Amino acid sequence: MTEAWRYSAQGISVALRVTPRGGRDDIDGLETLANGRTVVKVRVRAIAEGGEANRAVTELLAKALGVPKRAVRVLSGTTSRLKQVAVDGDPNELGEALRKLTAPKPD
């Protein structure tokens, strides 16, 4: 499985599949879509209305990656479950943090 993020000089760009009204705010690992694209599965309690789910996603990622909220922004997919999100910061540290967050969880 390939990584669901790309590195840049400013940080990383992460492909997400978001489940609004998912019961809890959490990162559920990686998923390969039917087209072969790898995404990070994210669920949030917020509803997908008025940008609430997008705000919840950016807050969740900021907290999980240890960056300020202003360092996370939705690049594309604001009205879609599939989103591209930019995270500003050290790309190597962010990539390592995402690897740990998306690693398979023991049963």
UniProtKB/Swiss-Prot annotation:
SMART domains for the chain: DUF167
Source species, domain of life: Bacteria
InterPro entries in UniProt: DUF167 (IPR003746), YggU-like_sf (IPR036591)
Residues spanning the signal sequence: none
Family: Belongs to the UPF0235 family.
Annotated protein name in UniProt: UPF0235 protein RPC_0058
